[in-house]
């Protein structure tokens, strides 16, 4: 089955800086900005571009330990970034993959980020709504932590 969510957040950080910090430099920025969510990121394959596979060690703010991700698309001009979670205990043994699509749009004095998440479950498995809501809340927490880090640095 497929379950889909979309969330949006407004930021005072300019689109280019937000894109760079959130995605291009995420391996170093995110663990510094939100260590309780993401402890470390290790590149398993690739050079940081499309096709790169990473192992992410999660922090104490989540009930999970790891996730394996694959970068699917990066557009530095359109400020879009897509990655898929393809492994780890975060998939709960009922999810085949989780696609995360991000788009940052410049606004007067900042930017707007939209995240579309597509959960591809195994067979007819259904992810409980509270799990999806919790994942969405964690994404917003992560975004706000990165935003605060970028504003301070």
Swiss-Prot record:
Species source reads Panax ginseng (Korean ginseng)
Keywords, alphabetical: Cytoplasm, Endonuclease, Hydrolase, Nuclease, Pathogenesis-related protein, Plant defense
Q: Could you list the residue ranges that cross the membrane?
A: none
Q: Where in the cell is it found?
A: Cytoplasm
Q: What is this protein called?
A: Ribonuclease 2
Recorded hits in SUPFAM superfamilies, A to Z, give: Bet v1-like
Summary of the function given for this chain in its UniProt record:
Catalyzes the two-stage endonucleolytic cleavage to 3'-phosphomononucleotides and 3'-phosphooligonucleotides with 2',3'-cyclic phosphate intermediates.
- Broadest EC class? hydrolase
């Amino acid at each position: 089955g497929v379950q889909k969510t979309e969330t949006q957040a407004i930021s005072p950080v300019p689109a280019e800086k937000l894109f760079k910090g959130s995605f291009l430099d995420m391996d170093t920025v995110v663990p510094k900005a939100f260590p309780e969510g993401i402890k470390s990121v290790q590149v398993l394959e690739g050079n940081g571009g499309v096709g790169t596979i990473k192992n992410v060690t999660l922090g104490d703010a989540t009930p999970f330990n790891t996730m394996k991700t694959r970068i699917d698309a990066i557009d530095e001009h359109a400020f879009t970034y897509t990655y898929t979670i393809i492994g780890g205990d975060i998939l709960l043994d009922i999810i085949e993959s989780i696609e995360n699509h991000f788009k940052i749009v410049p606004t007067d004095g900042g930017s707007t980020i939209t995240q579309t998440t597509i959960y591809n479950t195994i067979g007819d498995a259904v992810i409980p709504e509270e799990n999806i809501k919790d994942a969405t809340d964690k994404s917003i927490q992560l975004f706000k932590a990165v935003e605060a880090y970028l504003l301070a640095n």
